[in-house]
Curated annotation (Swiss-Prot):
Pfam families cross-referenced by the UniProt entry: COBRA1
Subunit description: The NELF complex is composed of NELFA, NELFB, NELFCD (isoform NELF-C or isoform NELF-D) and NELFE; the N-terminus of NELFB binds to the NELFA:NELFCD subcomplex. Binds RNA which may help to stabilize the NELF complex on nucleic acid. Interacts with the first BRCT repeat of BRCA1. Interacts with KIAA1191. Interacts with NELFE.
One GO CC annotation: cytoplasm
Cell compartment(s), UniProt: Nucleus
Any one Gene Ontology molecular-function term assigned to this protein's record: RNA binding
Official protein name in the record: Negative elongation factor B
Residues bearing the modification N6-acetyllysine: 519
Stated role: Essential component of the NELF complex, a complex that negatively regulates the elongation of transcription by RNA polymerase II. The NELF complex, which acts via an association with the DSIF complex and causes transcriptional pausing, is counteracted by the P-TEFb kinase complex. May be able to induce chromatin unfolding. Essential for early embryogenesis; plays an important role in maintaining the undifferentiated state of embryonic stem cells (ESCs) by preventing unscheduled expression of developmental genes. (Microbial infection) The NELF complex is involved in HIV-1 latency possibly involving recruitment of PCF11 to paused RNA polymerase II. In vitro, binds weakly to the HIV-1 TAR RNA which is located in the long terminal repeat (LTR) of HIV-1.
Family: Belongs to the NELF-B family.
Keyword Thylakoid: no
Record PTM Phosphoserine, positions in chain: 557
Length: 580
């Protein structure tokens, strides 16, 4: 408790103990100790007895004086740190640290020592090592001091960052399995600026500060974890951290990160959920501006483009461009904007392979994607448009048109063999579901059972699909629709993929009142957890069971329904109005 006082020549409890042990008159010894070590203020001696009369303990008085002096000292240290030339003020702080460091383990004075260290841009190495070696001191020191420790101790910094990265991934994954199913409030709804206010991003931003070395360490952790897990949420964090530092105008980092301007431009596109022609040209300029010998930058750019929020924006923009091309009667190969979107999409999707192989080249675009797959997708858009127009015609002008219900074999093959085709195809499915286009959805569902890398059974697609399906709630009363959706799609993968099982249960929990009773019973049985199912599936299934029980209680039994007479309410008798 009194560690360090002796080094400064200040008497402490041990000195008093020794004095009392060796003295013959303890009361006189105590009085002398108080005189020598009390507050040396002549006017105070006459005031202290007055405090005694009021029953105020001397300890309480001295503690209040001590606290006041400590606060003044802390203010003075902060003032020194902001006054005069840098060299002079740092010299003063270093001298102060040298004199006070021996008190660092004394709880009452520790804040002063920590404050001095906090304001020093370079704390002496010896003192940093002493702080690092003591867990209590390390925990108590300011983040400004910790940064100086971390920059030369990657393992310790990794220990600090690791729990935050785990927390971030858990938050993203739990958002994808949210109980709310909505088109308006989904995983991609929060704006980039809102997302950057999240706890993990803010704490990482604070930990990095303006330290380029720590920033590079975080990026290295994110690359390593992305390679190890293939989890694309690490790519999101890479972009969010850079833009969080951008928001704070941390030029020391933003000016040295070659991806800064590219990320800034892409961030604006994500905010608008669309890549317009002007920004498309800017993004193209950054890609074309990568000089020979600097190709490694492509690895970082691809990781930023692999962020699900970037992929979502690029894919939505691609589908929108295809719709515009249909109206303009233009082929995909003749649209520079569309080709650039595909180039960016390909770079994002190839991020893992590029970083893993360390071959920093843009992926080659499949010619057939542009000359065959996208025109085929445009023909689907034409089918949708002509069918919708026909349905709106007066009865006498309607032609007996039925919506195409088969898929070209080549389309299914594209979804299975080409990642780019699969990604764009899945976003087309999301588009037609959002348009409440039941016919197009039923036509495409069989093609989703087998896709490149099982992308159709990925959490992001299923999260968006289940949200969009809420718009088709009335169709769930039709057994054929439920059979196509559940039996023909979800149940083909739910036994082997727990995430699909969870998304199917989420959808059913939300829409169970609309599902035909016979089909609901069959689905409840089909989605029953097995012995290998995780807790999340069991919890969702339990929730579904509770919802169905509540539904049963609300429904009248057949006997009650038969006994209930027709609702004939007698007219209430109305009193005659009083005479005026």
């Amino acid at each position: 408790m009194f560690a360090g006082l002796q080094d400064l020549g200040v008497a402490n409890g041990e000195d008093l103990k020794e004095t009392l042990t060796n003295c013959t008159e303890p009361l006189k010894a105590i009085e002398q100790f108080q005189t020598e070590n009390g507050v040396l203020l002549p006017s105070l001696q006459s005031a202290l007895p007055f405090l005694d009369l009021h029953g105020t303990p001397r300890l309480e008085f001295h503690q209040s004086v001590f606290d006041e002096l400590r606060d003044k000292l802390l203010e003075r240290v902060s003032a020194i740190a902001s006054e005069g030339k840098a060299e002079e003020r740092y010299k003063k702080l270093e001298d102060l640290l040298e004199k006070s460091f021996s008190l660092v383990k004394m709880p009452s004075l520790q804040p002063v020592v920590m404050c001095v260290m906090k304001h020093l841009p370079k704390v002496p190495e010896k003192k940093l090592k002493l702080v690092m070696a003591d867990k209590e001191l390390y925990r108590a020191c300011a983040v400004e001091v910790k940064r100086q420790i971390w920059q030369d101790n990657q393992a310790l910094f990794g220990d600090e960052v690791s729990p935050l990265l785990k927390q971030y991934i858990l938050e993203k994954e739990s958002a994808l399995f949210s109980t709310e199913l909505s088109v308006l409030h989904n995983f991609f709804s929060p704006s980039p600026k809102t997302r950057r206010q999240g706890e993990v991003v803010q704490r990482l931003t604070r930990m990095v500060g303006k330290n380029v070395k720590l920033y590079d360490m975080v990026l290295q952790f994110l690359r390593t974890l992305f390679l190890r897990t293939r989890n694309v949420h690490y790519c999101t964090l890479r972009a969010e951290l850079l833009m969080s530092l951008h928001d704070l105008d941390v030029g020391e980092i933003c000016t040295v990160d070659p991806c800064h301007k590219f990320t800034w431009c892409l961030d604006a596109c994500i905010r608008e959920r669309f890549v317009d022609s002007k920004r498309a040209r800017e993004l193209q300029g950054f890609l074309d501006g990568v000089k020979k010998g600097q190709e490694q930058v492509l690895g970082d750019l691809s990781m930023i483009l692999c962020d699900p929020f970037a992929i979502n924006t690029l894919a939505l923009s691609t589908v929108r461009h295809l719709q515009e091309l249909v109206g303009q009667e233009t082929l995909p190969r003749d649209s520079p904007d569309l080709l650039l979107l595909l180039r960016l999409l390909a770079l994002g999707q190839g991020a893992w392979d590029m970083i893993d192989s360390q071959v920093f080249k843009e992926p080659k675009m499949e010619v057939e994607l542009i000359t065959r797959f996208l025109p085929m997708l445009m023909s689907f858009l034409v089918d949708d448009y002509t069918f919708n127009v026909d349905q709106k015609l007066p009865a006498e002008e309607k032609a007996p048109v039925s919506y195409p219900n088969t898929l070209p074999e080549s389309f299914t093959k594209f979804l299975q063999e080409q990642r780019m085709a699969c990604e764009v195809g899945l976003y087309y499915v999301l588009h037609i579901t959002k348009q409440r286009n039941k016919n197009a959805l039923l036509r495409l569902l069989p093609g989703l059972v087998e896709t490149f890398g099982d992308l159709a059974f990925g959490d992001i697609f299923l999260h968006l699909l289940t949200g969009n399906l809420a718009l088709l709630a009335d169709e769930f009363a039709l057994e054929d629709f439920c059979s196509s959706l559940f039996d023909g799609f979800f149940l083909t993968a739910s036994p082997r993929k727990e995430n699909v099982h969870r998304h199917a249960l989420r959808l059913l929990i939300h829409l169970h009142p609309r599902v035909a009773p016979s089909k609901l019973e069959a689905l409840q049985k089909a989605l029953e957890p097995t012995g290998q199912s995780g807790e999340a599936v069991k919890e969702l299934y339990s929730q579904l069971g509770e919802k169905l029980e509540q539904l049963d209680h609300r429904k009248p039994s057949p006997a009650q329904a038969a006994e209930t007479p027709a609702l004939e309410l007698p007219l209430p008798s109305v009193p005659a109005p009083a005479p005026l």
